[in-house]
Amino acid sequence: MALIRKTFYFLFAMFFILVQLPSGCQAGLDFSQPFPSGEFAVCESCKLGRGKCRKECLENEKPDGNCRLNFLCCRQRI
């Protein structure tokens, strides 16, 4: 009986430790270096995934708000 209780507490503690770890997309994103295309990462999007955060929008994109610091939320022109 005591072994089952200890196993339960161990698994319960491990669950909460794993929950506290950030996901791969969020881990270190604030300190990541941007890619040459001007994007931070695939997971760095804005406007519900319809735009990308860039320093400058491409020719076929228009600025549609701000992401953070000096970055614009760029969306495709329609």
UniProtKB/Swiss-Prot annotation:
Keywords: Antibiotic, Antimicrobial, Defensin, Disulfide bond, Secreted, Signal. Disulfide bonds join 43-74, 53-67, 57-73. GO terms for cellular component: extracellular region. Specifically expressed in testis. InterPro entries: Beta_defensin_dom (IPR025933). Pfam families: Defensin_beta_2. This is Beta-defensin 105. Residues 1-27 form the signal peptide. Belongs to the beta-defensin family. The gene is DEFB105A. Has antibacterial activity. It is found in: Secreted. One of its GO terms (biological process) is innate immune response.
